[in-house]
């Protein structure tokens, strides 16, 4: 998972899309399909965490507060 943390959001999403494509084609042997599914679920959770974090940052920036005015 440490290599996942080093990947950027875009790279993780690109890998996830590739895995989905492989699974949708239905040509992978069972064990490879299971491994791809497992990796895909990890990437999906990682991407969701990053999106949630970005949303919180945006909300924090967009929320007016009196003590942060320039």
From Swiss-Prot:
GO terms for biological process: DNA catabolic process. GO terms for molecular function: exodeoxyribonuclease VII activity. It is found in: Cytoplasm. It catalyses: Exonucleolytic cleavage in either 5'- to 3'- or 3'- to 5'-direction to yield nucleoside 5'-phosphates. SUPFAM superfamilies: XseB-like. InterPro entries: Exonuc_VII_S, Exonuc_VII_ssu_sf. Keywords: Cytoplasm, Exonuclease, Hydrolase, Nuclease. It comes from the Bacteria. Bidirectionally degrades single-stranded DNA into large acid-insoluble oligonucleotides, which are then degraded further into small acid-soluble oligonucleotides. This is Exodeoxyribonuclease 7 small subunit. It comes from Magnetococcus marinus (strain ATCC BAA-1437 / JCM 17883 / MC-1).
